From Swiss-Prot:
An annotated Gene Ontology molecular function: structural molecule activity
One Pfam family, short name: TMV_coat
Protein's name according to its UniProt entry: Capsid protein
UniProt keyword list: Capsid protein, Helical capsid protein, Virion
UniProt subcellular location: Virion
Main location: virion
Amino acid sequence: MVYNITSSNQYQYFAAMWAEPTAMLNQCVSALSQSYQTQAARDTVRQQFSNLLSAIVTPNQRFPEAGYRVYINSAVLKPLYESLMKSFDTRNRIIETEEESRPSASEVANATQRVDDATVAIRSQIQLLLNELSNGHGLMNRAEFEVLLPWATAPAT
């Protein structure tokens, strides 16, 4: 018994693009309360989101029978998740000085504004992702999944 792959674009469903819905929702709620003033803090939360994703289906392993899973590569969630991941990466863009050892007052003010802008962008993307998840976008169960990728059972003998 295997999934009946009829198109090359069906291989995407075997990638590590799946998450437990409750874990993803909880991560969004938790991340909204985090501070993003340092790159280390942004990296930590980005890694927490990344760690939620796993492969749950293989050509020989059927979609879980019970419950729903978040498919982060769905048309609605993919752009939100990608924007969120990009908003975490502000390394080497926060402080741009002519002399790193002695930033001027305007360079410090500019860096502070960039950190604030990054924080606003992160929170905005998390809230958008949370809204779509709460509305049920990007969630699939076995029946919905197997409309896209049929499970072929062995013929009775």
